[in-house]
Amino acid sequence: MRRFSFIFCLLLLLGLSSCEDFLKQTSQNLVTPTTVSEYKDLLQGEGYFQEFSTHARFINFMTDDMEYINYPGSSPSTSSYINMYQNVYCWSQEIENDNFKDEWYGYLYSQVLAGNICLEYLDEVLGSDAEKKVLRGQASFQRAYAYFLLANTYGEPYDATKLGEKCIPLTLTATPVTERYERATLGEIWAQIKSDIAVAVECLRDYSAASNFEINYDAALLLAQRVALYMNDYQLATTYGDMLLERKCDLWNISELGPMLTCSKQSNDGPSVTGQTEGF
């Protein structure tokens, strides 16, 4: 009798464990990256600022490079772009516009996340030291450029005398947290941008990218120069610029270019024009 009871209990335990395994939920399309190559694919798929122009279009309307011309027979109400962006260049504290939603902020933080994921798990993935170095450089560039755009859109301009002023939230991890992100200071944000782009320049120095559509050394030098320029570090900007010109010495004289139009309507005196046409 004891023997039969033991066998019954054993079969019951096996059955319960089998049911537990059967009921476990697994995603049919979930892939966990394990190699440097897979993380590079993740960075290119989730990062690389895809759909950049779509989300950043309204930024142009915040500058004096845009001009609205009311052509005969046209009306602002008939232009989706005017309807959507007409309040962007407005200094009111409270602005209501049901036609426009600022998706630029969230989009840029999704680009930060792509870089953070690669950097956070870099030491755990399979790959050579050389491959990891390239991924570190590309992910650092990704994060630096995203924070550069965020800081310049939603923060005060860089000012060495106001480094304690609040800027934007700063996160360097891909791990979700329940606490609300606090705004970092101007000094903290720009120090991180400068640090990340310096890492990108160093890590990509000896890397020959497979195509121009991959984050490379030239792109890192160009962004590094721009960051130094925005930080009023003209000596460092000159250094990065000279390094880039040694590699890419062909210059384009932009003074020979005519006015650039954002639509097909011709203008004689405006640098950029948007009108009724939908050709943006």
Feature map (PLM): residue ranges:
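Bacterial Sec-type N-terminal signal peptides, specifically the leucine/valine-rich hydrophobic h-region
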Residues: L13-L16
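Conserved, well-structured interaction surfaces
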Residues: Y81-Y154, A184, A198-D206
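Short coil/turn linking the two alpha-helices of tandem helical-hairpin repeats
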Residues: A151-Y158, S208, Y230-D233
